[in-house]
Every structure is written in C-alpha cells, then in structure tokens.
C-alpha cells in the first residue's frame, strides 16, 4: 500500500486503530482491542456480530516482535501465525501467514483473513 512503514505499523498495532479494521464482513465488528506488543505479551480482540447474536475473544501471545519488520504469535488454540512488513521509499507490503484450523474449509479461512487485510488497507489509506 502507498503508505510509509511507520504509519502502517501504527495502524496494525494500536488498539484504537485495530477496532476500525479488524472484521471479516460488514455485519461483524471489534468493539475493543488490547495489545501488549512484546515477546510474551498478549493481544485480545473482541469480535462480535453487530446484531449481538454471537461474539468471541480472538487472542494470542507474541512469540517474537521485531519492530517494523516481523511479528510472530501463537493463538489461544495453539496455532502459529506471523505478519511480515517490508517497505521501500513509497510503499509498504504486509504479508500475514497463519496455520489453518480444522473445523472450517481452508478457502473460507483464507477469504476471512484476506477480508480483514483488505479492511486494514482501506482503513489505513483513509
């Protein structure tokens, strides 16, 4: 995306920003987020259907944090994930990888995570 790395990192890691982009569809939202961005630190995002019919805490523990470069984490169910940031003078690339869970089809999971990334980009570019 056409934003400097520092701005992208802030939008990705700041709870006040996370609540604006962390949803996979328009009928869901994140009413609050907590983020202790350091190895051993915990993140929790409260994800809820806007109609109040369902909600859950999406959480994990940071395994490795290299500021402005890499975040590795373990989700509450033990799956691993990572986010890589790379930049040149005018743009920043964000790549998120995750271990799929076994309940839902991989394509459905990929589409959900991609929708969140798309919402992140839309929010960050405002």
What are these regions (language model features)?
Residues 1-28:
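Hydrophobic ligand-binding cavity/cleft-lining segments
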Residues 5-6, 37-38, 63-68, 84-93:
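A short, structured loop/turn motif at beta-sheet edges
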Residues 123-126:
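Short, highly charged C-terminal tails/helix-capping segments
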Residues 1-4, 48, 65, 86, ...:
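Solvent-exposed residues in well-ordered beta-strands and their adjoining turns
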Residues 29-72:
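Glycine-rich portal/gate segments that line the openings of hydrophobic small-molecule binding cavities
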Residues 8-9, 18, 43-45, 62, ...:
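Hydrophobic pocket/interface hotspot
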């Amino acid at each position: 995306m056409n934003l400097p790395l520092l701005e992208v990192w802030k939008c990705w890691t700041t709870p006040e920003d996370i609540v604006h982009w962390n949803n996979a569809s328009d009928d869901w939202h994140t009413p609050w987020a907590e983020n202790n961005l350091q190895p051993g630190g915990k993140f929790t995002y409260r994800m809820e259907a806007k109609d109040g019919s369902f909600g859950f805490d999406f959480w994990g523990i940071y395994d490795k944090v290299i500021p402005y470069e890499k975040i590795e984490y373990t989700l509450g169910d033990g799956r691993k994930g990572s986010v890589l940031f790379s930049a040149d003078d005018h743009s920043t690339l964000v790549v998120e990888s995750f271990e799929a869970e076994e309940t839902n089809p991989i394509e459905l999971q990929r589409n959900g995570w991609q929708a969140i990334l798309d919402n992140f980009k839309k929010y960050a570019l405002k």
